[in-house]
Amino acid sequence: MSVLDEIIDGVRADLAERQARVSLDELKERVAKAPAAKDGVAALRGDGVKVICEVKRSSPSKGALAAIADPAALAADYEAGGASVISVLTEQRRFGGSLADLEAVRAKVDIPVLRKDFIVTSYQLWEARAYGADLALLIVAALEQPALESLIERAVSIGLTPIVEVHDEDEAERAVDAGAKVIGVNARNLKTLKVDRTTFERVAPEIPEGIVKIAESGVRGPHDLIAYANAGADAVLVGESLVTGRDPKAAVADLVAAGTHPALRHGRG
């Protein structure tokens, strides 16, 4: 069994427990009373390379990364540093996240918030909106094509911007065929958990113009952002290097400065 399969098995077990406690109708009622979702696509377009900053306590590849007692405070630092979107891990078993983290971050920041999890049912999309997410991650490798297409459609219908994650050219083709408007290319191999920063430059040419392209994994600092930008990235997603660093706000500001350097503006937007 692959790492992804193990994670999804755990996700389904935890999901069943939540569904037993909170009905879909309850989630829908909460969403109906919630403010409209922020425009995730608009947040990722425009001049320069946008920075998505992640609240991430642990990972399957590295184990514990940071305690993060106050995810809202960390998110506020990210926002103050110039982040365009905050990503919140809500998977508990491998990443140490929760829906409570998502809710706390949403209450603290004004920029769009992404629910990053292993979403396999529409119930999780309703959860995402109910707890304040504006965007939701959908992983091609975790979904059959009909499910991927259905979840993209459902996400959009309830106000979420789906970020469709791919790892290779075939998955990119599936994402495009499913109607993705935002595609994240993850440089981390799901089987080996190793990062290959050349993944983005291989896969990005398969993604048509007009679709927002996000480079995920492997961003250690401004030099990696610039490399991804030169390969066509509209945005980068950064987690580990921020939560393990001494000054997240300053680190984000450095990334944002690199992403808005005049030399990178030509041809972007």
Curated annotation (Swiss-Prot):
Gene Ontology BP annotations: L-tryptophan biosynthetic process
Enzyme class, first EC level, given as a word: lyase
UniProt keywords, alphabetically: Amino-acid biosynthesis, Aromatic amino acid biosynthesis, Decarboxylase, Lyase, Tryptophan biosynthesis
Keyword Kinase assigned: no
Enzyme Commission number(s) of this protein: 4.1.1.48
Pathway(s) per entry: Amino-acid biosynthesis; L-tryptophan biosynthesis; L-tryptophan from chorismate: step 4/5
UniProt catalytic activity: 1-(2-carboxyphenylamino)-1-deoxy-D-ribulose 5-phosphate + H(+) = (1S,2R)-1-C-(indol-3-yl)glycerol 3-phosphate + CO2 + H2O
Recorded coiled-coil stretches: none
Matching CDD domains: IGPS (cd00331)
Example of a GO MF term: phosphoribosylanthranilate isomerase activity
Family according to the record: Belongs to the TrpC family.
Stored PANTHER family: INDOLE-3-GLYCEROL-PHOSPHATE SYNTHASE, TRYPTOPHAN BIOSYNTHESIS PROTEIN
Designated name of the protein: Indole-3-glycerol phosphate synthase
Origin species: Streptomyces avermitilis (strain ATCC 31267 / DSM 46492 / JCM 5070 / NBRC 14893 / NCIMB 12804 / NRRL 8165 / MA-4680)
Gene transcribed to yield this protein: trpC
